[in-house]
UniProtKB/Swiss-Prot annotation:
Species name: Rhizobium etli (strain CIAT 652)
EC number(s) given by UniProt: 7.1.1.-
GO cellular component, one term: plasma membrane
Domain of life: Bacteria
UniProt name for this protein: NADH-quinone oxidoreductase subunit D 1
Upper lineage: Bacteria, Pseudomonadati, Pseudomonadota, Alphaproteobacteria, Hyphomicrobiales
Amino acid sequence: MTEHNVRNFNINFGPQHPAAHGVLRLVLELDGEIVERVDPHIGLLHRGTEKLIETKTYLQAVPYFDRLDYVAPMNQEHAYALAVERLLGIEIPIRGQLIRVLYSEIGRILSHLLNVTTQAMDVGALTPPLWGFEEREKLMVFYERASGSRMHAAYIRPGGVHQDLPEKLVQDIGDWCDPFLKALDDIDNLLTGNRIFKQRNVDIGVVSLEDCWAWGFSGVMVRGSGAAWDLRRAQPYECYSDLEFDIPIGKNGDNYDRYLIRMIEMRQSVRIMKQCVNRLLSDAKTGPFSSIDGKVVPPKRGEMKRSMEALIHHFKLYTEGYHVPAGEVYAAVEAPKGEFGVYLVSDGSNKPYRCKIRAPGYAHLQAMDFMCRGHQLADVAAVLGSLDIVFGEVDR
């Protein structure tokens, strides 16, 4: 009887794998079908964003944030704008805050819709993505009507938002809400009670709450394990403290709980959007949508035609940019994927001295090995989908 040396089998997952959500390369060590080790290789989409921001003025840095988590672009701009505003010490008028919150929640729905439906596709359900993309298309049109661009909006800027929303657009967003909930019910009916979907997700990728904190998780990952931690509640920014919404939490910390939380969060986002729309059409119908500080926010076209002072301000803002007082600040928002933070250091000039970006997906991806060990090879795609990783923000 000859002895056989049994050794583990190494395979590459990606970087052009349909379930890899971008340019992820995982080196998997398998013992038969069982995953022994997962090695994520990142950096294939590295563009040097943080370094590039150091060479741009504070306004020119805004578009870089759209290109991080490109599924929900405005949520990143929001964090950056908050950081700059804290350094400048300026307040945003209530209409501007409501517009920002409205579009942040649209971004949350954009992200969750894509994640829930593509994760379903990864485990074999082919209908939800088609239904989800139909709704996302309508939201992309709202992005386009506000900023002129479907994805890279550069709409939320330090000092407020780029331009005011027409009343018709606000009404259309309000009209979109209820039909969307019906479409969400359809997706819900297809997946939530589906036997195959549950077999692929229940008790897969379980993380305890202690492990969540140890790995630096945030957002849905933490809430799926039972902590009601949401920055919109825990550290309210903008006008979230005046809005009513619930925070769903899971109790098993598995893929299925995270899926359920994303489904409920979309309904809560619609609830927030309805409140914003009502206020934008009633008490906040008129009024400034961005700060009235002429040194930060460009003047109106009409003023520029009449006032030399306004013309000079406009020219200086778009050439040299405004100078931000020296200091450092960390501003975080509850992005769809978790806590998206911007640590901004200013040296008093017109360019950031350092802009550190804290992407939630980066912390989640490093736990891939911890979460997949002992699972089947087929579960790797299910866990990866449940983490909700977009490579723009991981590699930056």
